[in-house]
């Protein structure tokens, strides 16, 4: 029993740059007429097995379902590509760990210039002013990672300052606390000792 397939003629042109020449993607189309499945046409590309930018496809005769699936996969890949590039802007050397379902009072201070500790998901924006301590109390009921950044034009060589916050359940936080311990909050005048003792490095991983 043979299953007939309706073939249509498609002309598809992708956006390309001017300094790139248009070239055809060589492909071979093999029709499996004895196959009763939905995919009766299998396409074999000699180039990369997905639609590539700066290329042109024209005069293709095959099932419309396979063309739609190919375009759909390429669309999802292009949408996720910007997300993958933006992940590097969220990377931090240290991650601040805090417990959930607890009222947390955050006291901030700055050593050199004015900063702004800003996490949009938690609704927190604290200005860190040198010589002045600012505080803010917040409550977090959702466990997970929260990302933020410094929302202040600090000055020269002060840019791209991301923040990564990890909220753990209270029971897990107690285990983590017992393993790593709390930081030593020492008010010192030395910048090196200030960064090592007061910089909450032991409170992060």
UniProtKB/Swiss-Prot annotation:
Alphabetized SUPFAM superfamilies for the sequence: Cupredoxins (SSF49503)
Molecular function via GO: copper ion binding; cytochrome-c oxidase activity
Key words, A-Z: Copper, Electron transport, Magnesium, Membrane, Metal-binding, Mitochondrion, Mitochondrion inner membrane, Respiratory chain, Translocase, Transport
A Pfam family: COX2
Cofactor note: Binds a dinuclear copper A center per subunit.
Needed cofactors: Cu cation
Residue sites binding Cu cation A2 per the record: 150, 152, 154, 158
InterPro entries: CcO_II, CcO_II-like_C, Copper_CuA, Cupredoxin
Binding-site residues, Mg(2+): 152
Keyword Transport: yes
Major localization listed first in the record, in broad terms: mitochondrion
Cross-referenced Gene3D superfamilies: Cupredoxins - blue copper proteins
EC number, as in UniProt: 7.1.1.9
Annotated Gene Ontology cellular component terms: mitochondrial inner membrane
Binding locations of Cu cation A1: 115, 150, 154, 161
Subunit structure: Component of the cytochrome c oxidase (complex IV, CIV), a multisubunit enzyme composed of a catalytic core of 3 subunits and several supernumerary subunits. The complex exists as a monomer or a dimer and forms supercomplexes (SCs) in the inner mitochondrial membrane with ubiquinol-cytochrome c oxidoreductase (cytochrome b-c1 complex, complex III, CIII).
Function comment: Component of the cytochrome c oxidase, the last enzyme in the mitochondrial electron transport chain which drives oxidative phosphorylation. The respiratory chain contains 3 multisubunit complexes succinate dehydrogenase (complex II, CII), ubiquinol-cytochrome c oxidoreductase (cytochrome b-c1 complex, complex III, CIII) and cytochrome c oxidase (complex IV, CIV), that cooperate to transfer electrons derived from NADH and succinate to molecular oxygen, creating an electrochemical gradient over the inner membrane that drives transmembrane transport and the ATP synthase.
Family under the similarity heading: Belongs to the cytochrome c oxidase subunit 2 family.
Name of the protein this chain belongs to: Cytochrome c oxidase subunit 2
Species this chain originates from: Paramecium tetraurelia
